[in-house]
């Protein structure tokens, strides 16, 4: 978007573009982020809830425009959020959507292999192949891979090969790496999710997610069925691939597992991303983080919002996503407790980010930080931030 506006820019990437979280997404492009609109109305009122919905609609439309003519497997699909037991939650969500001027349907039966209480359906959403999309999008852009930013001095980025001076800086590093501004180490935690790709499984003709955070998700990718689930807070125990494989054996006994992968998401305190000025004490420094597992529309919203802000323009969605908004939620207490436990735990292996005790992840054979989500290989190499360095001993 900055390129199209004629704004000079440089994008620096520590590794390779889309080599991290993006390559492991299930790439659902939808305004339907769980049962979110009833929660937003209760927390923020109709004004900011409406901003959130309009931002997601704008993001979906921008994808339609950009993907037109691209070979990126873009398909329009209906999206469903289902509940296993509480139909009342679905009714409340439909009512909230109607108040915001958006229509959804209640669906009683789904092409899933287990009974549900029902689902909220939204028509004409989309799915695609994010790597194919970025490969098309990145052609001709000013991108410098294998160029990690080691330090920010004002709006000058310091890299191993030199400095980049700019009028504005956008920090889009998944988990923000500057600790002294914005308190993101308290305002975020990370959550791991797992996916298996099944061959010889049915076409479910849509995108499905459980309203419960630890529930299952489904979508097809050509001749494969992608089943997601087994999630847990990073550094804690969860079902992971074991849970997914048990599910597949029970419900899709004729299917064959072709692939497996995992991803990690930054979770905000109130379910809304932090997009905008990094903090009230920093100027010309911006951030995009806390996408809460909905990175496709959230990243596009970030692109539209931040490209406006760095050009000095106003944006109609800025208020609801403001990183400086009040976020006094129960999760803040949980995050603080986890940090205290991690700092006080008697162990020799500690995260170089802020010193929390690391936990061994036996399913993925990694050292994981339960405080902020950094992860390391068995030999100590950093594979997930916010830590920026390897373990000194393993």
Protein language model annotation of sequence segments:
Residues 196, 346-394:
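Rieske [2Fe-2S] iron-sulfur-binding domain
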Residues 124, 212, 241-246, 252-335, ...:
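C-terminal catalytic lobe of FAD-dependent flavoproteins
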Residues 4-24:
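Glycine-rich FAD pyrophosphate-binding loop
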Residues 20, 24-55:
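Glycine-rich active-site loop/strand segments that organize a redox cofactor
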Residues 96, 119-168, 172:
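Helical element adjacent to the flavin cofactor pocket in flavoenzyme catalytic cores
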Residues 221-257:
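Conserved FAD/dinucleotide-binding core of flavoprotein oxidoreductases
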Residues 152-220:
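Flavin-dependent oxidoreductases
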Residues 35-42, 61-136:
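Flavin (FAD/FMN) cofactor-binding and adjacent substrate-gating region
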């Amino acid at each position: 978007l900055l390129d199209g506006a004629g704004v000079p820019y440089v994008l620096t990437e520590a590794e390779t573009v889309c080599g991290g979280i993006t390559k492991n997404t299930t790439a659902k492009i939808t305004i339907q982020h769980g049962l979110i609109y009833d929660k937003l109305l209760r927390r923020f009122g109709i004004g900011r809830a409406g901003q959130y919905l309009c931002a997601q609609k704008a993001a979906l439309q921008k994808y339609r425009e950009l993907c037109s003519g691209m070979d990126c497997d873009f398909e329009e699909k209906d999206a469903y959020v289902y509940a296993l037991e509480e139909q009342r939650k679905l009714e409340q969500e439909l009512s909230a959507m109607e108040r915001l001027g958006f229509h959804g349907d209640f669906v009683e039966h789904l092409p899933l292999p287990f009974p549900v209480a029902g689902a909220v359906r939204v028509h004409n959403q989309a799915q695609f192949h994010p790597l194919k999309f970025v490969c098309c999008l990145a052609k001709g852009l000013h991108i410098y891979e294998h160029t990690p930013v080691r330090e920010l001095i004002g709006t000058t980025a310091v890299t191993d090969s030199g400095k980049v001076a700019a009028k504005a800086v956008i920090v889009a590093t998944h988990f923000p790496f500057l600790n002294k501004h914005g308190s993101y180490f308290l305002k975020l935690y990370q959550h791991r999710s797992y996916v298996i790709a099944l061959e010889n499984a049915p076409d479910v003709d849509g995108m499905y997610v459980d309203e419960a955070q630890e529930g299952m998700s489904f979508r097809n990718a050509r001749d494969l069925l992608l089943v997601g689930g087994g999630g847990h807070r990073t550094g804690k125990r969860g079902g992971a691939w074991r849970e997914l494989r048990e599910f597949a054996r029970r419900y899709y006994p004729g299917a064959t597992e072709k692939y497996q992968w995992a991803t990690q998401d930054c979770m905000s305190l109130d379910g809304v991303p932090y997009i905008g000025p990094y903090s009230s004490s920093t100027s010309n420094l911006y951030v995009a983080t806390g996408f809460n597992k909905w990175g496709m529309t959230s990243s596009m919203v970030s692109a539209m919002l931040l490209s406006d802000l760095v050009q000095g323009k106003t944006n109609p969605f800025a208020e609801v996503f403001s990183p400086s908004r009040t976020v006094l939620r129960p999760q803040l207490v949980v995050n603080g407790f986890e940090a205290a436990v991690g700092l006080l735990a008697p162990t020799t292996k500690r995260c170089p980010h802020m010193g929390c005790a690391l936990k061994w992840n036996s399913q993925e054979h990694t050292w994981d930080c339960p405080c902020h989500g950094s992860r390391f290989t068995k030999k100590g190499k950093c594979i997930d931030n916010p830590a920026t360095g390897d373990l000194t001993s393993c």
